[in-house]
Design a protein with these regions (language model features):
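Low-complexity, glycine/serine/threonine/alanine-rich intrinsically disordered linker
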Residues: 2-31, 44-60, 64-822
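Short, aromatic/basic-rich helix-turn unit that serves as a nucleic-acid recognition element
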Residues: 34
Length: 822
């Protein structure tokens, strides 16, 4: 039943204090209050009144330039709204939130296929998820059209064809091979030089352009002019010390050996180890000591080279093959941006004799290495249709198709007519003289493009409490934590009733969250909660910031995910997102942050931070700090809005229409704070900016790339239209401000972090709502608030530790409710 508010009390209060900005003529923040229903019958209405209560409690409304309500008047309104919304929360929670039927997303599709076939699907084979905002697991926001169906059908066919091709191939013995990249490179250079020398000799002997094989006389003169730079440069390269034993990377005038590479044949079922031995060729800036390692077009790691000609450094990385990997190139290049070599060398202040910085001695490969157990597909195919002599083929085919379909449909029995249809397709193909493998392609592709595979189907109970079955709960837990269907161990626990036993459930969840598969929780949930998509999309001018190349961008994104993954595995407190004594970095980020790095390979490692380090937590990462910029300079406004939304659990209001751009309003050099103050003087901007701008200044010691600074350079730094000779000056950074919801001041990063930690209950709620939305595949509603209150209260008693929070979510009845809408 509805909860009815006091019309007389609230109408008078709103008319007196609110309608000027939130009434028929103006709706600041897209909010209108005079038409808000006093009958709270649903979550939307309750949520709107909750927002009113929140801003009144925080003292944000009415604004300072409007008449304030008396203490007694405000006290009565707050008490009435609080009591009414508490009743609404309880009544609405009894009906629960509805979960729309949801499709498995790209990440879940890849991991589900991996479980079925033991094959890794490359991203380029899958259609995009097309999620504008929110989590990619939320059914209401997912789109699926005939375009998606056609793409998934094509992808399924590719997967099945590769799986059938390799399913009965013998597993090869692992071998170690060594490639000397200079052999191919030097052979090419010698041939190139010989051809140039031969032509030049004939020209000197009086041969015409036609006799030499050159287009015309003009091209002949151009050939003579370029002879020394082209042939001479290659000759000089071949004469360099150790050029006959390895390859110098990125040498000027010789693009053919800018990379060290060779081709290898791969088994898509296997994992390989790649190694290379390298040395620093000459004294160059440290920024030029990093290599990028790729397999085909995929970058798989970054390495810092610190070896010498006498003692090279050896680097190794593992690579799990994709199903499209059959013959691919393994190559290493110097890690730098997209600038031309000449521009890049000029930017880094290169003064060495040669342009090359790194010498590669050799490239090595070891493998293939196979998983210990066969995939479901391999095991069941070899037991039925994959035998050397198949007895009773029809029976074996039906047995295989039924077992595969049931596994693909997550232990749900397929409809008899569906199995009959795929079985008849197999029979028809066999009658048309196709092999067993050829006959299986279309039937299995149909299974993998069926709604029962692409959508997570949960049956609604017909009687009693509306909870999912134990098997459905097992899959719900597994897709939540691992982005893949439940394995045999979890399904057996469900069958034994262990998921309803809190002690057994906790043991199961701890094991799952310590397993490597829990990486998908960082990859899927945390990257979306932290809004790392914004970091991916922000444009940084590489010519102005040469250190910020793809290597730093990719590494910084992974750092944020690795921090959360470490918190999950070690059951650390959520406050580690604010302040921690560690971070998780690779060698490239260690250089970027000026930190010591103990592990000399590209794999990420958890490192302890020095006592005085500004790093620590999500807010100390390049990913967070860079997406809190406008691409040219740090932005307290953007950082403040991100902090408010993620860490203080309050979504900033959208800007009013026609709001002016935050831009320089003076010809004089201005600090970021002065620019923001100019913006806040505008009446339409002040009320919102007063709430989150002060937060952003707490991180102002970090520049737009997340590097520490004590001073700010004033002027049109990085602007293309900046006037030459324009004066700039440097002033000390002032990282001070105030927390908007408590008026607690801070005057440096340490005090800012302490203040944010004191608001940890808001971060806990932000993460809790995010995890619940991600895990259930639906938006959080007002009806869910009582459950979230209970979850957060229990998590707080355990110091907001991540695994404890996840346990509280999964054991709560809200996580076990059945879907109610389709």
């Amino acid at each position: 039943s509805a909860v009815t508010l006091d019309r007389k009390m609230l109408s008078g209060f709103i008319e007196k204090h609110c309608t000027k900005c939130h009434g028929p003529k103006k709706q600041k923040g897209e909010t209108r209050l005079d038409t808000l229903s006093i009958e709270i019958t649903n979550s939307d209405t309750a949520l709107q009144w909750q927002e009113v209560l929140d801003v009144l409690n925080l003292g944000e409304m009415p604004p300072d330039d409007e008449p304030a309500p008396s203490t007694e008047e405000l006290k009565n309104v707050l008490a009435h709204l609080t009591e009414a919304l508490t009743k609404s929360k309880k009544r609405l929670s009894e009906s629960g939130g509805d979960t729309a039927l949801r499709r498995i997303n790209r990440r879940e599709y890849k991991y589900t296929i991996d479980d079925l076939f033991g094959l890794r699907v490359p991203d380029e084979l899958l259609p995009p998820d097309d999620i504008a905002e929110g989590y990619d697991t939320v059914g209401h926001d997912q789109q699926f059209s005939s375009y998606h169906f056609d793409d998934y059908l094509k992808t399924a066919k590719t997967i099945v064809e590769v799986a059938l091709k390799w399913v009965d191939q013998p597993r090869l013995e692992a071998k170690h091979s060594v490639n000397q990249p200079e052999e191919r490179t030097n052979k090419h250079l010698l041939s190139y030089v010989a051809d140039y020398d031969k032509k030049m000799a004939r020209i000197k002997a009086g041969a015409t352009h036609t006799q030499v094989g050159i287009e015309d006389e003009r091209q002949l003169q151009l050939f003579i002019k370029r002879y020394d730079s082209r042939a001479g440069g290659r000759k000089r390269y071949l004469q360099r010390t150790f050029a006959d034993q390895g390859i110098y990377l990125s040498d000027a005038g010789s693009s053919s050996h800018a990379v060290g590479s060779y081709q290898i044949n791969m088994d898509p079922r296997a994992t390989y180890k790649f190694r290379f031995a390298a040395a620093i060729a000459q004294e160059t800036p440290t920024i030029r000591h990093f290599l990028k390692c790729r397999v085909g077009e995929r970058t798989i790691g970054y390495f810092k080279v610190d070896g010498s000609f006498e003692k090279t450094s050896l680097h190794e990385i593992e690579y799990r093959a994709h199903l499209s990997d059959t013959r691919v190139g393994f190559n290493v290049t110097e890690n730098r941006g997209n600038l031309s070599l000449g521009t890049y060398l000029q930017k880094v202040g290169h003064k060495a004799e040669w342009s090359s910085s790194i010498w590669v001695d050799r490239l090595e490969t070891e493998g293939p290495f196979y998983p210990n157990t066969p995939s479901f597909f391999e095991k069941h195919y070899l037991q039925t249709l994959g035998q050397s002599e198949v007895e009773n083929e029809d029976e074996q085919a039906k047995r295989f198709l039924l077992a595969f379909t049931r596994e693909a449909f997550r232990q749900k029995d397929p409809a008899a007519e569906f199995i009959d249809r795929v079985y008849k397709l197999f029979q028809l193909n066999r009658k048309n003289k196709r092999s067993i493998k050829e006959s299986l392609v279309t039937p299995l592709s149909m299974v993998l493009s069926s709604p029962s595979f692409l959508y997570i189907m949960e049956d609604s109970p017909t009687t009693g409490e509306q909870f999912v079955s134990d098997t459905e709960l097992a899959h719900r837990i597994s897709y939540f934590l691992w982005s893949r269907p439940a394995n045999g161990q979890l399904l057996q626990a469900a069958a034994d009733g262990k998921l309803s036993d809190p002690i057994m459930l906790r043991k199961i969840l701890d094991e799952m969250l310590k397993h490597r598969n829990s990486w998908s929780l960082a990859e899927g949930f945390f990257s979306q909660w932290a809004d790392l998509k914004r970091f991916d999309e922000i444009a940084i001018n590489e010519a102005e910031h040469i250190s910020f190349n793809n290597g730093i961008r990719e590494s910084a994104r992974l750092e944020a995910q690795h921090i959360f993954h470490a918190m999950v595995k070690e059951n650390r407190s959520l406050t580690d997102l604010i302040d921690s004594n560690f971070t998780v970095i690779n060698d490239l980020l260690a250089f970027h942050y000026n930190l010591e790095y103990p592990d000399k390979d590209s794999e990420f490692a958890k490192v302890s931070l020095p006592a005085n380090s500004p790093r620590g937590g999500m807010i100390g990462t390049t990913a967070f700090l860079t997406m809190g910029s406008n691409g040219e300079r740090s932005s307290p406004i953007i950082r403040g809005a991100l902090l408010m939304e993620k860490f203080l659990h309050r979504e900033p209001s959208p800007p009013p229409p026609n709001v002016p751009e935050l831009a320089l309003a003076s010809d004089e050099p201005l600090s970021v704070k002065e620019i923001v103050d100019l913006h806040r003087k505008k009446a339409q901007c002040a009320s919102c900016h007063n709430s989150f701008d002060p937060l952003g200044f707490g991180l102002e010691n970090f520049d737009l790339l997340g590097q520490w600074r004590d001073e700010e350079t004033l002027g049109n730094v990085g602007k293309k239209n900046s006037k030459k000779g324009k004066k700039t000056k440097r002033i000390p950074i002032q990282a001070k401000g105030v927390f908007p919801n408590s008026n607690r001041p801070f005057k440096n990063l340490r005090e800012f972090r302490e203040g944010l930690v004191d608001h940890k209950h808001l971060l806990t709620r932000s993460i809790s709502e995010g995890l619940l939305s991600y895990g259930l595949g639906r938006h959080i509603e007002f009806a869910d608030q009582q459950a979230i209150d209970e979850i957060c209260t229990n998590a707080a008693s355990n110091n907001e530790q991540v695994r404890d929070l996840i346990f509280e979510i999964i054991k709560h009845p809200i996580f076990r409710r059945s879907d109610k809408t389709e």
